[in-house]
């Protein structure tokens, strides 16, 4: 399944806020309509939609998300928490959470166009897994700084503060303090439902 490139509002109306996909917000539904919709959902659909939240928020293909789940199963610890750590420590997401890009797709574009350095070296792989003490910064070129500055200006009013595991040293440079704790994930998700979804598919 390919990466989603359709209307973002269509997805957030169905799944709720997806800050990695877009900083737009859908119009709030009244409580009665929300309850009516939730009452009609099967358990399978509830698990599916929670899985889709992950896919669309982080901009992943189904095959990519399934691969992360396979890694999480084989890793010591809670499968759901490990899965969230793997997704949150992707380079494109770190750039987004630092506020150097307005969305994860915008962050991915920065990486693909070789505007980003990790520990002084160009990294052009959005899925690169960041580690504790990694330093993320723009290349020392006017084009890179301008590109990131435009992203920062665009997202200033919607940008959240950097979570505890990250420090924005200045607009073009950030530090990974540590591996993320699950309580610092940037949007509402029940990762246990995602784990249940994949376990039931196997």
Curated annotation (Swiss-Prot):
GO terms for molecular function: rRNA binding; structural constituent of ribosome. It is found in: Plastid. Residues 89-152 form the S4 RNA-binding domain. Keywords: Plastid, Ribonucleoprotein, Ribosomal protein, RNA-binding, rRNA-binding. GO terms for cellular component: plastid; small ribosomal subunit. One of its GO terms (biological process) is translation. The keyword Isomerase does not apply. CDD domains: S4. Part of the 30S ribosomal subunit. Contacts protein S5. The interaction surface between S4 and S5 is involved in control of translational fidelity. One of the primary rRNA binding proteins, it binds directly to 16S rRNA where it nucleates assembly of the body of the 30S subunit. With S5 and S12 plays an important role in translational accuracy. Belongs to the universal ribosomal protein uS4 family. NCBIfam families: PRK05327.1, rpsD_bact. This is Small ribosomal subunit protein uS4c. It comes from Epifagus virginiana. The gene is rps4.
């Amino acid at each position: 399944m390919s990466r989603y490139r359709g209307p973002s509002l269509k997805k957030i109306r169905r799944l709720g806020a997806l800050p990695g996909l877009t900083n737009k917000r859908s119009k709030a539904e009244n409580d009665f309509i929300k309850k009516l919709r939730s009452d009609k959902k099967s358990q399978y659909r509830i698990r599916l939609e929670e899985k889709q939240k992950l896919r669309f928020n982080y901009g992943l293909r189904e095959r990519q998300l399934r691969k992360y789940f396979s890694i999480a199963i084989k890793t010591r610890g809670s499968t759901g928490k490990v899965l969230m750590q793997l997704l949150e420590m992707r380079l494109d997401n770190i750039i987004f959470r630092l506020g150097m890009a307005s969305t994860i797709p915008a962050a991915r574009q920065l990486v693909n166009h070789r505007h980003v350095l990790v520990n002084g070296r160009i990294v052009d792989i959005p899925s690169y897994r960041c580690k504790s003490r990694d330093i993320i910064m723009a290349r020392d070129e006017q084009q890179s700084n301008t590109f990131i500055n435009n992203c920062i200006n665009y997202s200033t009013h919607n940008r959240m503060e950097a979570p505890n595991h990250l420090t924005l040293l200045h607009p073009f440079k950030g530090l990974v303090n540590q591996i993320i704790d699950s309580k610092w994930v940037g949007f509402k998700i029940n990762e246990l439902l995602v784990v249940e979804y994949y376990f039931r598919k196997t």
